[in-house]
Swiss-Prot record:
Part of the 50S ribosomal subunit. Forms a cluster with proteins L3 and L19. In the 70S ribosome, L14 and L19 interact and together make contacts with the 16S rRNA in bridges B5 and B8. Keywords: Ribonucleoprotein, Ribosomal protein, RNA-binding, rRNA-binding. InterPro entries: Ribosomal_uL14, Ribosomal_uL14_bac-type, Ribosomal_uL14_CS, Ribosomal_uL14_sf. This is Large ribosomal subunit protein uL14. HAMAP family: Ribosomal_uL14. It comes from Phocaeicola vulgatus (strain ATCC 8482 / DSM 1447 / JCM 5826 / CCUG 4940 / NBRC 14291 / NCTC 11154) (Bacteroides vulgatus). Pfam families: Ribosomal_L14. GO terms for cellular component: cytosolic large ribosomal subunit. The lineage of its organism: Bacteria, Pseudomonadati, Bacteroidota, Bacteroidia, Bacteroidales. One of its GO terms (biological process) is translation. Binds to 23S rRNA. Forms part of two intersubunit bridges in the 70S ribosome. Belongs to the universal ribosomal protein uL14 family. Gene3D superfamilies: Ribosomal protein L14. SMART domains: Ribosomal_L14. NCBIfam families: rplN_bact (TIGR01067).
Length: 121
């Protein structure tokens, strides 16, 4: 459950390390985002000599949340951190690698994320 002012780990190799949610997309009164949702983020910390600059505004896809996700079979899954991958203006992933596991719910939202991830839970 991500809301405005939530800080997320960036888990791709775009060069950003941490991002701050500044908008949840999908309606005027929408407050929370979960796995598979797109948000607008501000980059808070970057690695040196990266293409992404600190303070840059970008869209991001949420791939992991601390808040558990209920599945159709009644089971729940949750992760240790809130993480996202950065997207470009066309909605494609900016990086070429993804670090850490991602949720199976992303299959419907974005197939490329699932194929790049080392583990799908």
């Amino acid at each position: 459950m991500i809301q405005v002012e939530s800080r997320l780990t960036v888990c791709d190799n775009s060069g950003a390390k941490e991002a701050l949610c500044i908008r949840v997309l999908g309606g005027t009164k929408r407050r929370y985002a979960s796995v598979g949702d797109v948000i607008v983020v501000s980059i808070k910390s970057v690695i040196p000599s990266s293409d992404v600059k600190k303070g840059a505004v970008s869209k991001a896809l949420i791939v992991r949340t601390k808040k558990e996700i209920r599945r159709a079979d009644g089971s729940y899954i949750r992760f240790d951190d809130n993480a996202c991958v950065l997207l470009n203006n066309a909605g494609e992933i900016r990086g070429s690698r993804i670090f850490g596991p991602v949720a199976r719910e992303l299959r419907a939202a974005n197939m490329k994320v699932v194929s790049l991830a080392p583990e799908v839970l």
